[in-house]
Amino acid sequence: VRSSAASDVYKRQAAAVQLLKRIHEIELYEFKEAIKQINEYKMEINDYLDIMMIWFRDILLYKATTDVNGLIFKDEVYDIKKQASKSSYSGIEAILEALEKAKVRLTANVNFDLVMELLLLTIKEN
């Protein structure tokens, strides 16, 4: 049971990171497919959103310090550096706020697909 749970966590993390690495290249019409992928993790959506938060925490940390030692996603340094150079502090803040807002909306039973679409749009814009 333990290795199955660990592999689920790894799959969830890999899926979230893959999406975040290519979010700026995704066209709007591809969002539906991305949301369908996220839907696979609907039961663990808070964990999925936490992974996204950690990703943007790493981007913010690198942008502020240019130090890779404090990063959680150490194996993704190249992509973190790339996104840190493209993102502004206010953009990262907007994304982190959107992640929190998504959690609140999901707790309030707002339509899952709509919440994810708004979140992905905010991430893409920033």
List where the protein language model places each region:
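Charge-biased C-terminal accessory regions appended to nucleic-acid-, cytoskeletal NTPase
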Residues: 87-126
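General "foldedness" signal
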Residues: 5, 37, 66, 110-113, ...
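Single conserved hydrophobic/aromatic residue that forms the stacking wall/gate
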Residues: 1-6, 10
